[in-house]
Regions:
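Catalytic alpha-helical scaffold of carbohydrate-active enzymes acting on polysaccharides/glycoconjugates
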Residues: 3-97
Length: 97
């Protein structure tokens, strides 16, 4: 299952690179080791793929207030779960996002 998710994520990034008009939004809910959502390890693999393909993560404000390059994307985290702070925030800092 993990390999399948990584393949789909990589294909989505590659499709984005060839579509100059789209700004994709990747929506996450829980990111933790015990949920049925994404584990921190899988989320980190997603961030590595984003870096590998030189994607730029932007905020909603940046989306509305500046010219967006073709490699821009949004990462969103719904519902304000504590695991977003515990697991996601340190990984985003680690990868300068």
């Amino acid at each position: 299952m993990m390999i399948f998710i990584l393949i789909i994520f990589t294909l989505a990034i590659l499709l984005i690179l060839f579509n100059k008009r789209a700004v994709p939004v990747f929506l996450y809910h829980q990111v933790n080791p015990i949920s049925s959502s994404v584990s921190p390890e899988i989320f980190e693999e997603h961030l590595k793929i984003i870096k590998k393909y030189n994607m730029e993560t932007i905020t909603i404000s940046e989306y509305y207030n500046k010219n967006i390059n073709k490699n821009s994307m949004l990462l969103t985290f719904d519902d304000g779960y504590y695991d977003n702070f515990k697991y996601v925030f340190p990984l985003l800092k680690k990868y300068n996002m």
